[in-house]
Every structure is written in structure tokens, then in C-alpha cells.
């Protein structure tokens, strides 16, 4: 993976970029950087593999649908939307530096766009694709079906596990699309690239 070229393109698009050899070193970096803050986390296999909730919740107030006890999903999502820091993995990233996420309820794609002091976007090497079309294809036809299956959805993509069927199922999880061509105004963004396969 040519992270040098990708880093250069992301920086040209206005993003701060950090590159790590493995998930452990990336998690240690984030654990050092984020301290004494309110932190929102989108649902993410990548971040679960990095054990970020456990690490960060030791010295931050963390809101994560997958991990925060004692609150409803809706309460957690609202608190995550207004947290100082927001963390999300990416479903796809092009070599040109375009960042793609697909969402079912919209909590993650909306939180990425606005409302925080800083947003960290995390991607393993498997999320990188040649161009925008390939990154979008990856998000819809690889990440989407695998996530639907993980969540126990009864959608065609989860059952067959091979591609997006653009279905009308009430359990469909790909309902909203976020594409960041350039760094949005209003807050700081950092893309965390990890030279390991992580998540879907």
C-alpha cells in the first residue's frame, strides 16, 4: 500500500494525516492524544479490534452505541453528536483522498460532518481503493454485506454475502452516504491510516 501517495493527497485535501504500522501503535497514539474529553464513537469493527472504547473510557467520557451501559441507543447517539471528539472508521477511501461512509440511521455520517472540536477518521489498508468509484463499490459491496451479516440483518446482502442488492428491506443498513472530498470547515480533521487489515 502506497501510504506516502495517499497521505500527500489527503493533506492536499486539507486533512491532517497520521500513519502507523499497526493497530496497537495507532491505538496508543489516540489514547495519548484524547484526554479528559467527551468522545463520541460510531459503530466500528476496526475500533473494536483496536480496543479503543476500553482505552479511552479510562480517562474520557465516551459515548458508543456498542459499549456504553445504562443509556438507550438514542441517548448515546445524541450525546455522541455533540461530543468534543468524534471517532469513526471509514468504509472506503480512494487513493485520491476521498473518504466514504455508508450508514443506516444517519448518526455516524451526520456526526462526521459537523459539531465537534476534532474528528478522527480511521482506516486500515484494506479500506483503500484505486479511485472514488472503486472506494464506493467497496463500501457498498464489501463493507455493507459484511456489516449486515454481523448485525444479524435479514437482507439479501447478509444472506448471500456477495454484494449489495439495493434492496427495499426494512432492515437495510445502507441508507445514507457521506463523501468527504475536502476537509469540511468548522473543525479539525485527522485521518489515521494503519498498515494492517482492519474491520470490513
Model-derived features with residue positions:
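N-terminal active-site beta-alpha-beta segment that forms phosphate/nucleotide-binding
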Residues: 2-87
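Conserved phosphate- and dinucleotide-binding cores of soluble alpha/beta proteins
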Residues: 81-200
Amino acid at each position: 500500500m502506497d501510504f506516502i501517495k495517499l497521505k500527500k493527497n489527503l493533506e492536499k485535501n486539507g486533512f491532517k494525516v497520521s500513519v502507523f504500522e499497526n493497530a496497537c501503535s495507532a491505538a496508543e497514539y489516540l489514547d495519548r492524544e484524547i484526554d479528559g474529553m467527551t468522545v463520541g464513537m460510531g459503530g466500528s469493527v476496526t475500533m473494536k479490534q483496536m480496543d479503543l472504547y476500553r482505552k479511552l473510557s479510562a480517562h474520557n467520557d465516551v459515548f458508543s452505541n456498542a459499549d456504553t451501559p445504562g443509556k438507550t441507543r438514542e441517548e448515546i447517539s445524541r450525546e455522541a453528536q455533540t461530543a468534543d471528539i468524534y471517532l469513526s472508521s471509514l468504509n472506503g477511501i480512494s487513493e485520491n483522498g476521498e473518504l466514504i461512509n455508508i450508514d443506516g440511521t444517519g448518526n455516524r455520517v451526520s456526526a462526521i460532518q459537523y459539531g465537534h472540536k476534532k474528528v478522527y477518521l480511521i482506516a486500515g489498508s484494506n479500506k483503500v481503493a484505486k479511485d472514488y468509484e472503486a472506494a464506493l463499490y467497496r463500501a457498498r459491496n464489501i463493507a455493507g454485506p459484511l456489516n449486515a451479516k454481523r448485525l444479524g440483518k435479514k437482507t439479501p446482502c447478509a444472506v448471500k454475502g456477495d454484494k449489495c442488492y439495493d434492496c427495499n428491506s426494512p432492515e437495510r443498513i445502507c441508507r445514507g452516504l457521506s463523501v468527504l472530498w475536502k476537509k469540511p470547515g468548522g473543525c479539525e480533521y485527522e485521518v489515521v491510516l494503519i498498515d494492517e487489515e482492519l474491520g470490513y
